[in-house]
Amino acid sequence: MDENEKQAASKPSAEGTVNHKRPSAKIIAIVCVVIVAVIAASACWFVNYQIPHNEAVEVFNAAAKGLDSRNAKLDDAISDLQDLMGSDDKPLDTSMSDAASAAIGDAQAAKKDVPEMPSDTDAINAEAKKIKGMGDYSEQLTALDTANQNLQNSIDQMKQVTNPSEQFVIERLQGLPNITGVEAAREQNDPNGNLHKDGGYTSAVFFSSDLVDQSQTYASEGYTGIPAIGTDGGGSVEVYATIEDAQKRDTYLGALDGGILSSGSHTVVGTCVVRVSDLLTASQQKAIEQSIIDSLTRL
């Protein structure tokens, strides 16, 4: 093969050459427009929908958290009162327990739970606005607090008049209107003979009153002091170990009411029986009795 043939053989054939064509400017422009449009649409969607939606969700969650907090405060107040009601301590005034139950029922009925979050942004905003206005429990919290305090006070009063000491009764009787003298009975001058006996009173404090015509009273023979005259001279406070003993005594005295053995008015306060002279009018008895009850139960 001569030199010319070698050169011809070494040259690539024009027919076997790959023709790499560049994309036209029109296609590039179209692609760019599409990309820009997609980016613009995405940005528009994010700005006009996703951001407002996220903000709405945040507002909703914040409102829900606020309502949860208000609900927790209400639940705590309800729980505190329920715990007090469930304790072994009993109130002096049982109506305080009824009032506490009513306050709890009203609070539970007023409680609002957080609703489910809607999917629509506008609906989320609307629901969040509603939630912010929910859970104003100021009235219920005040009622629960009042019921709690009243019940606790009544429990404390019951403890105070449950087998109180003799000295406590004496101190609470001294200085009351129309009570001129106070003296605790001893076994030697107890007109009823019930002191320290099984089912009898643990102490009995007698008092005299300036409303009683003492010339109409008579001391038990051989007895001295205010107790010797019994309840006729003014009255007495008999203290028992249990409510049952006090109620049993009150029932016994009630059987004598209206007869020649009637010894005056009588009422049970805790484990005490407050008695007032039969020589006083009904209104006088009531006034002295209430004065004594108020003093014994004063915290």
Regions found by a protein language model. Give the residues of each.
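N-terminal "mature-domain start" segment
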Residues: 76, 83, 94-98, 102, ...
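Short, solvent-exposed recognition patches
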Residues: 107, 174-259
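Solvent-exposed, acidic/flexible segments
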Residues: 162-166, 229-233, 243-246, 278-285
